[in-house]
Regions:
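Nucleotide-activated chemistry modules centered on ATP-dependent adenylation/adenylyltransferase
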Residues: 1-313
Length: 313
């Protein structure tokens, strides 16, 4: 059986990334370009998606003739119907849905309580499917064979209203297959692999966020504003987004900033696991809690207390 065929009410979760775009193409091909009436391709906009992501989604729709439903959470609507439909032209671009959610909750999401993904994406898409009259459906996620641990995690979570399908995983698709597909397409997502769809997602590794802050300092303002108005931190072990921006402005680009390894942030509505940063056993610098190792080395070096290199950090 073709894992990309849709049987019965189906929600195709389109994150706006290359992997979910590849999955959408395979699903369309499995149905000769015309999806069943009860199959819905849904993109849920948080308001802090990258401009390039929104353009890519619109281009997928135009190039492939796909009917993509654009949704945003609407906290003012009754429970169970907290969404409204938007389009490329009307989708929020200044974080409005996310900021509204933070105002309601009165605290910030974090690595332990990632209610941003739950409320802005999962529950918004769920409410849409309910509004179509479905009591049960299949939720299709863009998780690959090389993301087997994530596949196991999402399949282990029981849901009364939907079953989870991961056709890319079942078909043996890996990141290499996705990259090869987009290499020969007439259009592509105009983002680097480390950037991700969400401007400054706190699930990204610190090095990735610092690199993005160097390249796009304007992205930091919204995140810093939320921390300031709520009086909290997205990352409890860090000093905050405003301090991070000041840090990257003061310090030169370090080798660790270019390390492609690390966290991938939140993709397709599911967040990756945090990884522990590695600290060389030979390093004797005195790192304060929450302080990046490379920064501690630089400060120690500047104070002539420590001589070394950040290679291998």
């Amino acid at each position: 059986m073709n894992p990309f065929r849709c049987d019965g009410p189906t929600l195709v979760n389109f994150s706006g990334g290359r992997t979910s775009g590849y999955m959408l193409r395979r699903i369309l091909d499995a149905h000769d370009g015309t999806l069943p009436a009860d199959t819905h391709i849904v993109f849920t906009n948080t308001g802090v998606e990258r401009r390039e992501t929104l353009e890519f989604i619109a281009e997928c729709a135009d190039q492939w003739g796909a009917d993509i439903v654009w949704l945003q959470r609407d906290g003012k609507s009754p429970a169970g119907r907290r969404f409204h439909r938007v389009s490329y032209d009307t989708a929020a671009r200044c974080g409005e849905p996310f900021a509204e959610l933070i105002t309601e909750r009165k605290f910030l999401p974090n690595a332990v309580m990632r209610f941003c993904t739950q409320a802005l994406k999962i529950e918004t898409a769920r409410d849409f499917m309910r509004s179509q009259g479905y009591e049960h459906w299949t939720s299709v996620l863009g998780l690959r064979r090389d993301e087997s641990r994530r596949v196991s995690n999402v399949r282990a979570r029981a849901h009364d209203e939907w079953d989870v399908s991961c056709p890319l995983h079942d078909a043996g698709v890996t990141a290499a297959h996705v990259a090869e597909f987009w290499r020969v397409q007439p259009f592509d997502l105009r983002l680097k692999s480390y950037e991700g769809n969400c401007t400054m997602c706190f699930q990204k590794g610190r090095a990735k966020r610092e690199r993005i802050a160097r390249e796009h300092p304007e992205f930091v303002a919204w995140w810093a504003e939320q921390e300031q108005r709520v009086g909290g931190r997205f990352c409890a072990h860090e000093s905050g987004y405003a301090a991070m921006l000041e840090h990257v402005r003061r310090l030169p680009l370090l080798p660790m900033d270019l390390d492609p390894q690390g966290d991938d942030g939140c993709t397709g509505g599911f967040c990756t696991d945090r990884r522990r940063s590695r600290r060389p056993l030979w390093c004797m610098c005195k790192r304060r809690p929450g302080q990046p190792h490379a920064l501690a080395c630089v400060l120690a070096r500047d104070e002539m207390q420590h001589v070394g290199t950040t290679e291998g950090v």
